[in-house]
């Protein structure tokens, strides 16, 4: 079953139907408001790829190719690839914005409101430079909020390698 969503500047909005409530309640997509479900662009791309979302911009349908192109233009494509990989592995993935990370990751069986996220996920392309002070701050923030840091390195072939980073006291 496909639900229709409206593409805005930063989010996709879906009317609060039973399907939208199920997407949020059972699968933990987006943020539910009284009258609507609000999805991030990355969540919307994933649901679109899985055939669960028909995306509209005003009265025109947005094709999956157009939407993936939009993600690329906004610098979100690499984040989407990591999000998709983690979701396909059965994890609940939510924004990590307030922690300075791309995502928060819940263990399988965990969920927002029932458990705390276990990991913060940082997405790094293989050609990116990571400065030691930045890397140190990623680890310290994760440790400070009782989470582990998962670094997702994306290569030019779109393969992802994960490294679990933990803080230790010298």
From Swiss-Prot:
<dbReference type="InterPro" id="IPR036740">
    <property type="entry name" value="tRNA_intron_Endonuc_N_sf"/>
</dbReference>
<feature type="active site">
    <location>
        <position position="116"/>
    </location>
</feature>
<feature type="active site">
    <location>
        <position position="147"/>
    </location>
</feature>
<dbReference type="Pfam" id="PF02778">
    <property type="entry name" value="tRNA_int_endo_N"/>
</dbReference>
<dbReference type="GO" id="GO:0000213">
    <property type="term" value="F:tRNA-intron endonuclease activity"/>
</dbReference>
<dbReference type="InterPro" id="IPR011856">
    <property type="entry name" value="tRNA_endonuc-like_dom_sf"/>
</dbReference>
<dbReference type="GO" id="GO:0006388">
    <property type="term" value="P:tRNA splicing, via endonucleolytic cleavage and ligation"/>
</dbReference>
<comment type="similarity">
    <text>Belongs to the tRNA-intron endonuclease family. Archaeal short subfamily.</text>
</comment>
<dbReference type="GO" id="GO:0005737">
    <property type="term" value="C:cytoplasm"/>
</dbReference>
<comment type="function">
    <text>Endonuclease that removes tRNA introns. Cleaves pre-tRNA at the 5'- and 3'-splice sites to release the intron. The products are an intron and two tRNA half-molecules bearing 2',3' cyclic phosphate and 5'-OH termini. Recognizes a pseudosymmetric substrate in which 2 bulged loops of 3 bases are separated by a stem of 4 bp.</text>
</comment>
<comment type="subunit">
    <text>Homotetramer; although the tetramer contains four active sites, only two participate in the cleavage. Therefore, it should be considered as a dimer of dimers.</text>
</comment>
<dbReference type="Pfam" id="PF01974">
    <property type="entry name" value="tRNA_int_endo"/>
</dbReference>
<dbReference type="InterPro" id="IPR006677">
    <property type="entry name" value="tRNA_intron_Endonuc_cat-like"/>
</dbReference>
<dbReference type="InterPro" id="IPR006676">
    <property type="entry name" value="tRNA_splic"/>
</dbReference>
<feature type="active site">
    <location>
        <position position="106"/>
    </location>
</feature>
<protein>
    <recommendedName>
        <fullName>tRNA-splicing endonuclease</fullName>
        <ecNumber>4.6.1.16</ecNumber>
    </recommendedName>
</protein>
<keyword id="KW-0819">tRNA processing</keyword>
<dbReference type="InterPro" id="IPR036167">
    <property type="entry name" value="tRNA_intron_Endo_cat-like_sf"/>
</dbReference>
<dbReference type="InterPro" id="IPR016442">
    <property type="entry name" value="tRNA_splic_arch_short"/>
</dbReference>
<dbReference type="GO" id="GO:0003676">
    <property type="term" value="F:nucleic acid binding"/>
</dbReference>
<keyword id="KW-0456">Lyase</keyword>
<dbReference type="GO" id="GO:0016829">
    <property type="term" value="F:lyase activity"/>
</dbReference>
<dbReference type="InterPro" id="IPR006678">
    <property type="entry name" value="tRNA_intron_Endonuc_N"/>
</dbReference>
